[in-house]
Amino acid sequence: MIRQQPDGVQTQIAQDLGSDPTLVLHRPAFCLSSMRDQPAIGLHPVSDPDVVYSFHFYEPSELTALAAYRPGLDRAALARVPFPSDDAGCRAAADSAADDATRGLMAFVCSMHWDAARVGARIERAAAWGRDHDVPVLLGEFGATRALNAPARLAWLEVVRRACEQRGVGWALWGYDDSMGFGVDPHAARRPAPGGGVSGRSVMDRATLSALGLGAVE
């Protein structure tokens, strides 16, 4: 989508909406959908309730994805980093690390003091962009790996969710039944069901649902 020329994008939006009045279009608000990047170059948002501009949020990825971009780290130690950040928890996690590279990365992450205020400031950037252009904004992806310590993961999910809701930004968790999503067991839906076939059902993690402000899902 973002490779299209701006005029072509606008023309395509008009054509898509004209072809189906029930259609809701999602367009990236930022290059590569990440708020680490600049707003999509040449994008002139269409102020239409059926066009929603989305972005992704996984910051800091050293926490939410345990720095998956960097091989050779002690991820078991990295998974102990706290959220919200606190000095004592960071020191304890660093002391457990097996190598200097992991300790250095931990020091970098902890020095940024990620907490509700910092997350809120990042989400506010997208919310402000939407207000400035009078368009709806959606956090179309966010999540944290289940390998992260549970208190940090659940706190991060709740903080991001609340930051969105406080600013009128819609949100959608990354996955349904994978390690960054709602499910306890990513293979549950594919297990054999009584009488043949597969169950087609995933077991929802109640703690995750609670962090997201959702009730029990049967």
Residue ranges and their predicted role:
Residues 1, 5-9, 111-122, 152-156, ...:
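Soluble or luminal CAZymes and related metallo-dependent hydrolases
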Residues 1-113, 124-144, 166-167:
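Active-site region of glycoside hydrolase catalytic domains
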Residues 103, 110-111, 121, 127-128, ...:
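Aromatic- and carboxylate-lined catalytic core of secreted/periplasmic carbohydrate-active enzymes
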Residues 148-218:
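Aromatic-rich peripheral "rim/lid" segments of glycoside hydrolase catalytic domains that contact
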